[in-house]
Amino acid sequence: PNAITIVRILMAPIFLWMLLADGGSDGALRWWAAVIFIVAIATDGIDGYLARKYEIVTDLGKLLDPIADKVLTGFAFIGLSILGELPWWITIVVLIREVGITVYRFIVVSDHVLAAAWMGKLKTVAQAVALSLALLPLWDLVGEWIFWVNGVTMTIAVVLTIASGIDYVVTEVRAARARRAAASPTRDA
């Protein structure tokens, strides 16, 4: 499973190059970029499933898996913003949250592994759906209403991104307080 995660990380720059190579037009490279993104993000569930099924869940996997998601989605947000298809403020808000949580994961890794929480997983699914819709050049096939659908899915993804970031912070503050309370000697009155 860790090998799958590493391949997902390595697919990210290939995806970004294909997305940007022809200026983001609706040609073959855009379609291939979208397919690579969708396959790479979809394998997120596969590596986790295999790790649990064969009982080979590792701390490295818990650390690398969310990083693979962040690299893939981060490249997609950046690429869409470079192409002018997504406002930069959305990309910046998402990247601040993603980089912040990732840096925190590395800071606390010697103390404990900050595994993905349910809201973080929901956020990743919402981002994957919104980004997949934004990456697929469907406007020629189904019409301009796809932009409205993508706006709704992107809004949901951004709200969940912010909410899950807040959830991680609140959870970690509570856990830190509990660890301090457990480590400090009790006082008898």
Residue ranges and their predicted role:
Residues P1-A189:
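Alpha-helical transmembrane bundles and membrane-interface segments of multipass inner-membrane proteins
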